[in-house]
Amino acid sequence: ELKKEAQDYLDGKDMQADAQILPTKGDKKHYPLAFNLLPQIDVLEDSGYSHEEWKMIHETKKIMLNDMNAKDIKVTATCVRVPVPIAHGESVYFTVEDESATTQDIMDAVANFPGVVLEDDIKHQIYPQPINAAGKRETFVGRIRPDYENPGAFNMWIVADNLLKGAAWNTVENAEYLVKMNLI
């Protein structure tokens, strides 16, 4: 659908008229994805969150703490469908207990984590992009920077090939890491 919409746009045709699938196929209303962003992935609930956003919240807690209802980690999400054929991207905001932690401390930790590639060189405009993550199993992290309004808080941009790096592959990698660390 993305490819057809892009061609229709370039040919001067009305993309809206042919939209049939997004944001969800079962809905009455559809929008084109080409040259557009859709802040809805899956069905929107009365809470204002979509199924995909709830899944992201619960899966993060499950992966991090093995408990999708954990209160120890605070997670929220806004999922946006973007016009790329492969890869997901996430803008992540997080806090650390040690408020004296620096951007370099976070970069060092990220760079040493298995399966993660640090791409963070703002002077040379090096940062993760979906087009570069396609076909690779690694997760790419960059644009790490402090939140100057909140000590101990940081932002970063994460990209991975969603066809290769999903919840199942992450589970395998997490298990391998736990075995390596003699934790299981």
Residue ranges and their predicted role:
Residues 69-184:
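C-terminal active-site/capping subdomain that shapes the small-molecule cofactor and substrate pocket
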